């Protein structure tokens, strides 16, 4: 069986749940084709251990595609990331109490890595399912960006395609506030559409997905 590895994060910043994992775990075992299956795994939300855990999973599972996901506070849609940057600049401590500021993700690495996923086709597929989606130009500077960067760094010399998706809060996480959210079933459907499009699309669509600022 060929494997697509899909990851989400454990809860952080005193939240009891992380929607990325709650959504990803629903896709465990889903088949994208007769011989292609999603394997879902959870990553720690910690600079010291997240990348190592992801590397371990890649070594164990030998996936043909890897898509990491995480919570994007303030996001209102399925946000498919374009680029990871070589900087850690944590606004809050991670789950091990570490808060790196202006440090390199990989001192020997380039300034940035682009995703190798067909992000325009993925956005089109999610929107085609009636779910809000967009290409995102920044994955932040917390553990999500670090994992995204380390993922691309690890697979840069391989044929394994990889990238990162941010998801919104769940409605129950933002009760009484004006912050955007997305129902879990909608999130799951959006991720499924995105992952399926990523698997089925060898060459990305040529259409606008940028931002003015």
UniProtKB/Swiss-Prot annotation:
Q: What's its catalytic activity?
A: Release of an N-terminal pyroglutamyl group from a polypeptide, the second amino acid generally not being Pro
| Organism domain of life | Bacteria
Top EC category: hydrolase
Main location, first listed in the record: cytoplasm
Q: Where in or outside the cell is it found?
A: Cytoplasm
Q: Which GO terms describe its cellular component?
A: cytosol
Q: Where is the active site?
A: 81, 144, 166
Would I find Hydrolase among this entry's keywords? yes
Enzyme Commission code(s) on record: 3.4.19.3
Q: Name one Pfam family in it.
A: Peptidase_C15
Q: Which GO terms describe its molecular function?
A: pyroglutamyl-peptidase activity
Q: Which InterPro entries match?
A: Peptidase_C15, Peptidase_C15-like, Peptidase_C15-like_sf, PGP-I_bact-type, PGPEP1_Cys_AS, PGPEP1_Glu_AS
Keywords in alphabetical order, please: Cytoplasm, Hydrolase, Protease, Thiol protease
- Biological process terms in GO annotation: proteolysis
Q: Which NCBIfam families match?
A: PRK13197.1, pyro_pdase
Q: What is the protein's known function?
A: Removes 5-oxoproline from various penultimate amino acid residues except L-proline.
Quaternary context:
Homotetramer.
- Can you tell me which family this protein belongs to? Belongs to the peptidase C15 family.
According to UniProt, the name of this protein is Pyrrolidone-carboxylate peptidase
Please name the source species: Pseudomonas fluorescens (strain SBW25)
């Amino acid at each position: 069986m060929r494997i697509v590895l899909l990851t989400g994060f454990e809860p952080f910043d005193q939240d009891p749940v992380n929607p990325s994992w709650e959504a990803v775990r629903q896709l465990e075992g889903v088949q994208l084709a007769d011989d292609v299956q999603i394997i879902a795994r959870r990553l720690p939300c910690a600079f010291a251990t997240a990348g190592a855990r992801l590397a371990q999973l890649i070594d164990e599972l030998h996936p043909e595609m890897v898509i990491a996901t995480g919570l994007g506070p303030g996001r209102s849609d399925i946000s498919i990331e374009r680029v990871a940057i070589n900087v850690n600049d944590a606004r809050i401590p991670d789950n091990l109490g570490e808060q790196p500021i202006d440090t390199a993700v990989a001192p020997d690495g380039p300034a940035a890595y682009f995703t190798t996923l067909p992000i325009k086709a993925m956005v089109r597929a999610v929107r085609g399912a009636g779910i809000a989606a967009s290409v995102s130009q920044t994955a932040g500077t917390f553990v999500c960006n670090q994992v995204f960067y380390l993922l691309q760094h690890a697979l840069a010399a391989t044929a394994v395609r990889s990238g990162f998706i941010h998801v919104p809060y769940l409605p129950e996480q933002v009760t009484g506030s004006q912050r955007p959210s997305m129902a879990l079933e909608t999130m799951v459907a959006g991720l499924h559409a995105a992952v399926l499009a990523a698997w089925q699309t060898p060459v990305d669509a040529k259409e606008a997905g940028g931002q003015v600022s």
